[in-house]
Amino acid sequence: AFYHRLWWPDLVLIKRDAFRFHLPTKHHLIERLSAGELPQWFPYDALGRPFIGGTHTGVFHPFTALYVLLPVPDAYRASTLISCLLGALGAFALGRMLNLSRAGALLAGIAFALAGHAVSMTDNIVYLYSLCALPLFCLGIEKTLRNRIAWAALPAVVWATVFLIGDVQTGYYYTFIALAWCWARAPGPWLNTGLRLMLIGCLAALLAGIQLGPAWAVFASSDRTQPALFHEQALHWSTHPLRVATVLASPVGEYKDLPDIGRFFFGNPQRPWSVWAESLYLGVPVAGLAFLGAWQRRDLRVLALLGTLALVLALGRYGGLYDVFYQVMPLWSAFRYPEKLMGVVSFALAMLAGAGLDSLRTGWFRPAAWIAAATVCACAWLGLHTDTAGVWAAAEFGAPAPLARSVTESAAWAFLFSAVAALGVGLAVFGARHERLRGAWPVAIIVAIATLDL
């Protein structure tokens, strides 16, 4: 229901790259294809640049068929909607594969598709699709490890489509996700697991070769081959530590002047967009259930590992580890925007939240923890709601007084909403301790609270 407007005809996505970049390039693509030729050159950007080799044009991705059949704005909306549905259904299917209950898998799908990071990516189909394909990719790897080797085609095709739509960076990250998944969940000998993973990688490379070849030619002639020159640009849009708090409490001035908020509070001085993802929100209910899931389901610790590692890397210049990878890992220095890795954090937390919900269903009741979280959030609301908080923020961050007051006020309301959500979950958990209230109702209430909170 959240994405219902994507179903409406004659609407155009106009936010950021959707309108300024993707719609014009798709128009050019369809014009060239209609003329019976592949668009080798894009003359409308500076003095011109390669079109296919630019990767993010997504010439060979299956979504291109939508642009042939529909008007460009409608095709873009349809591809955005399909990506969101793919993410939700993929997370649900992966949850069932990981032995989550239907309710747990449902919560995982909802939390992943409605997470702030995923919603923020609706302005860029390249980044949105590669994020939403991640659950299906992990599902394919799990099936390949546990069933016939023919299942290797599924993760290979998903992986290839990530390259074909143009997100080579996330496709590169998929390599590390696949390695971690196989290391943690391989049921058989390491040799057999390694061969299956190599098969997946080779198939993906063959399928995506038509895009990776031109992309490599463009990359080889760019300044991205020189890490020392590209270092500052690569670390731009690192996730500021203050932004991590918005995973639990949001919005924090998100609907005010985003460039000024990014400039004064999150260390990004460049305009017009000083934050990469407009929201990183998941909420206290999802985060709390994710912690419980990681604690109770030891077989899913790979998700906790992936989420933690991705979070530290997403900090970029503030975390230090990204710089190490930049210097050590092959090709890592070719990519930018560390905050992209927050999508992996959202994925891991969403899946673990489903496992945490199942822990409540099996009798692991700790309502006091939820009441304590609600109390902490309520105290934060009381503290940030004062004029003193606005004065302190203006002095500490050098922000104009009206902006500082606006941010602290919105943060206060965000913590109040989080307190209410945490209290609601705590009451549902408390009720589930009693025989008369056990069953589907407490679980349904918790899922509803988490959904409404998102």
Identify the role of each PLM range.
Residues 61-64, 88, 112-116, 135-136, ...:
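Hydrophobic, membrane-inserted alpha-helices
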Residues 16, 20-33, 37, 201-293, ...:
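Periplasmic/ER-lumenal interhelical loops and adjacent helix-loop junctions
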Residues 125-126, 130-132, 144-160, 168-170, ...:
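Contiguous transmembrane helix-bundle modules in multi-pass membrane proteins
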Residues 70-74, 147-148, 165-169, 295-299, ...:
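Transmembrane helix interruption/hinge and helix-loop junction motifs
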Residues 4-98, 103-133, 242-277:
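Active-site lumenal/periplasmic loops and adjacent helix-entry segments of GT-C-fold
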Residues 85-98, 102-186, 196-215, 449:
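Membrane-embedded helix bundles of polyisoprenyl
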Residues 54-60, 74-89, 276-291, 345-353, ...:
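Hydrophobic alpha-helical transmembrane segments
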